[in-house]
Amino acid sequence: MPQNTHVEMADIEAARIAQEKKEPAADFAALRKNAEEVSRCLAWNPSVHASRFFSARWKAMAATLRPVLEKVGRAKRKQPEPDDLRWLRENLHLLWAQLWNTRNAFKQLPRLPHVLTPRGTTIPRAAAVAEAYLYAAEFDFSHASFTAYIGAFQESTTLKFRELWALIPAMELALLEQITARSRNVFDETQPSQSIGICIRSLIEINQLHWKEVLEPQIAFDQILRQDPSGTYPRMDFESRNLYREKLVLTAERSDSTEMEVAGQALELARQAQQTPSDDPRMALRESHVGFYLVGAGSNELRERIGFHPSLAHKIRSLLRRHPDEFYLPGIEILTFGLMSLIVLLLTSTVTSPALILLSMLVLLLPCSQSAVQLMNYLTTALLRPEVLPKFDFSKDIPEDCTTLVAVPALLLNEKQVRRLVENLEVRFLGNHNRNLHFALLTDLPDSPVPSREDDPLVDLCGNLIKELNEKYSGKQMGTFLMLHRHRIYNPREKV
């Protein structure tokens, strides 16, 4: 159970660890058992959704750690130098950077579930789990032990999507608190070593770890989405999968269902669509994809199932997406008229003649309309933010069912230019080796006052160069080269 609710508690724990004979923290069975016990001890507090827990803890820690780091930076190096002081001196820049990075990370944390600890305090569950893991591992972080601990914890208590990502800054804060507590007597050579190096090494490991690969397998509802009947979701890249997960989380937060239930309903809808006969196979494939109900046209069907309660902002965005023309064009007209009217009212009086007012509005029409267009563009991008387009992950290979042709359009002007076009095509090929990736020149001849010849020398040259490329790389089982030429028909009326 996490005990370090204050830096002072971390100080006590540091002294205890320094006095005890430590054993290697590689006993994953003990870690799993501890995770199960912590899971049973933490009681969810549904009445608390946000708190100043992280900011208060950071301020208390920073107030103590900053003077220590400043003193270490000013102190002259001595020989021999205590291990703790050496660790602080050699990693001074890292600790300063980590101090401010952690504060910035807490500013970006969303509302997190809170739990009631056995000591009667209410803290974010992510903080409780992070501290419990580090204490169980004796602050010696490793990828394997962290994965084992979180996996065991989630066997009885499922962490939400945002909680998993909050574990990273929560662990960094706990480690900084330990460094703060253990460094208070770092200049006292009579004091025993406090093993500051373990905490700093763990901080370095956390910063160097590829967290996308570590946390994605821990997302509980992600395993449901990977059962996508269309087989599309597992083949997508991380950013696209994360887009789906973010949409699912936002939907769950505004509904009567949990993240797991929303994922289950999306999967059920996709399976029902797969079993329903359809005359359009392409549409049937789309509707059998879980993304169709998370980010696509089927999202309303999913929201009806889970009891979605849209916010006012969501209603406005949905209305704008359904009626873009009715929003954009009339908006420009209204803003143009409003700007013109405002300027005319400020520059005229009750004795100004109507003809002069009309002339002023005509003069202001062009600049006001330009300003209105810019303002509408800003409002549109502010209300409807761009999103990642879902895409497949072809970083390792392009499967046969996604065979791709890269077509380069070009005009054939002269022999030198044709040879350069083919050379550039070969360069593209050499930078993208794949048996299912093919390259083509989409060629045409420039306009001419006379009909084009059937045996144009530039066309023949380009075709021969493409043929030579195919022969050159024929034995390497990679993509092929093509030339797709458009034979133009002479138009007597236009004389081209």
Enumerate the predicted regions with their spans.
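Active-site activation/catalytic loop segments of kinase-like enzymes and analogous catalytic loops
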Residues: 122-164, 171-185
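Internal catalytic domains of large membrane-associated glycosyltransferases
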Residues: 190-318, 387-496
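Juxtamembrane/interface segments at transmembrane-helix termini
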Residues: 187, 346-349, 371-393, 419
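Basic/hydrophobic alpha-helical interface regions
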Residues: 2-4, 11, 41-44, 48, ...
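Feature representing long, continuous alpha-helical segments
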Residues: 127-131, 147-151, 177, 314, ...
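Carboxylate/His-rich catalytic cores and anion/metal-binding grooves
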Residues: 353-379, 383-387, 445-450, 457-469
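Alpha-helical bilayer-embedded segments of polytopic membrane proteins, i.e.
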Residues: 169-178, 317-377
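ATP-dependent phospho-/nucleotidyl transfer catalytic cores
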Residues: 20-120, 148, 165, 479-495
